[in-house]
Structures are given as structure tokens and as C-alpha cells.
């Protein structure tokens, strides 16, 4: 059976380790959230958190994430030093017995949603992506040069119609959702309390004005080639998270979006320590992806699994659905991974807001009751499968 893990945001997380022990969690997915991006994770700091986790009868199974700084992605002047620091952190993790590291190579912005509490008929809510509202943010709020070329005439007309009715409060909420609330708690570039987040965001976008898809791919290859000797020496598996959503946004290149992209980076640095975080939610948000076929093809190079599902809607919109439904096909994925690469760490990724979760101040997507329900569903499925 897959290892049942849970993303936990450290000692300040409102969801405590004793709570997780009680609901069947075995492994913890976490990071040194107090260490600034690009600085070295010391053996002392790693072991301190590891010992704390183990004191509650749990284990630190996966690092999510050891952030890859922007200067590595766009090949800035600080790249070499940042890669050296990254290599030291990986070595220290390996020395401490933590062997799986999830990361992403998305420029500037991590996962993108436009609504953090989109209602369902049953009274729960989940994360939602509205393409027209995102286009409005891109064209009318960011005022990105050439943005209109990335949208159809019909979409541009809908943006114009939205501009007539959207309120200032709704604009502020859109900014907060897209570049603050969903980013800051995952080692993002903009955090709660930052002044003029739009200006900061525009400066970050400008860093990539000369970086196209090929250049970003080459920078990823360079990074992976540099760190693989350390991964081999200490037995650390790197597993890149797919782009979320898996298509180009804001004129930025995205290079982990589909079967060809995954095949490219696995072949570019063909090493068993260079692998994939199979995020069913991210991949299923693209209608071009069939998660079942991708799992069959890449199971052997998968080191970590995120179980989450989405439902595609009209106009390029999507919503995070129940773990029992949607385009993620999670039942099939569990079967595939158990057959092809058994024992992988798995975490239920995101969950609906329910039973008062929305009042607890949890990070977006990371409810307690919603994820607990999803975990119980996945444990039940896996247990049934073992007995059939």
C-alpha cells in the first residue's frame, strides 16, 4: 500500500501532529519554512524538525519544497552560488535520511486559482480557475504588453464586459488570490503584508522577458545536471511537480505540462534520481492530459504522488472536484502505481472547505476536514483493492 502522507507547514501549522496521528497519517511532507529561499538547510535544523516529527510517532517522508530560486530558472548572476547552496542542502537532507525532494520549475508564479472558496451545492467549497477573470487580471490589472494576443476575440469581449461590472473590491480580491494568498505560504515571491504586490509581480515578470521555452528547458537541464552527483552520492530522489495549470500563463514559458514535456526532462538528465511528482490535479486540469496513460508511462520514474482531481468546465474553467470524481481518475491511478511502483509516498492534495474549515485560517486548499475526508476515501479504496 502507498505510504499515507500529509503536507504539514511546520510547528506554526494550526493542524497539529497529534491530530494527524489520530487520522491515520504515517509520513509528513514538510520543509524548513523559516529558512529564506536560497539559504542552506543545515544538518542541525533538519534534524531538529525531524526529531520533533518523530516524537509524535510519525516520520519526515518528503521535502516539499526545497525551493528553486528564480535566478536559477532565468540563469541570473547568482545562479552558481544558489546551486552550490542547493547541493549542500540536498547533501544534508541525505545525511539525515530524508531522501525525497519535491520541487517545481515554474517561473514567478506557482499554482494559479481565481477563487479560493467556490461553492458546491452541498455547502462545501473548493478552489476554482475562471479563465475570463484570469484574463482580466492579465490584461486590465497587470496591463501586460501583448497580453491580448494570448486570448480569443470572444474572450477579449468577455473581459470587456467584465470590466463594466467588476468592483474595486473584486479587483483587490483577484490580486490577493492570484499573487498573494496562493503564493506566500509556499515560499512564494510575494507574501501577506507586502505593499504594491502588482508592482513587485511586474518586476518579476520582467526578469523573464528574454526567456523562452527552450531557454527555460536548458536552465532546468543545467540545474539537474549540476545536482545529480549529489543525489547519487546521498541517495536523494528529486521529483518535479507539474505546472499548475498545465498551460502557458502570463507570457511565461511552462515546461512540465504534458507527456512530451515529462519525457523531455526525464531524458535530458537520464538518471533514476531525476523523477516526477505525479500530481493528478495539476495534470488533469489540462484536457490534453489523460492521467491514466501518463501514470502507466511514467510510474517507474515517479517518486511521489499527489492525489487530487479536477472537473473541466466550459470556457477553459476548472474546479477542484471530489477525490471520488473528476478527470483525475484516482481509483485507476492507485491501481497503476501499486502495480508498477508500490510503496510510493502519497498525499491527498487539497481538500474541500467543510465543517467550519473556512473559519480556521488554514492555507488555501489545505483544509483539515476536507483533506481528512479525502484521506479516508483513499485509504478505503486501497484497502478494498488489497482484499479483492
Predicted regions and their residues:
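Histidine-acidic metal/acid-base catalytic patches
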Residues: 2-5, 10, 18-21, 54, ...
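A short glycine/small-residue-enriched secondary-structure motif
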Residues: 22-23, 58-73
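N-terminal ordered "arm"
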Residues: 13-37
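Glycine-rich, proline-tolerant flexible connector loops at the mouths of alpha/beta enzymes
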Residues: 31-47, 250
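Glycine-rich, aromatic-flanked loop segments that form ligand/cofactor-binding clefts
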Residues: 50-61, 98-196
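An N-terminal, globular interaction/scaffold subdomain
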Residues: 42-65, 82, 90
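Conserved beta-strand edge residues that scaffold enzyme active sites
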Residues: 34, 67, 107-108, 245
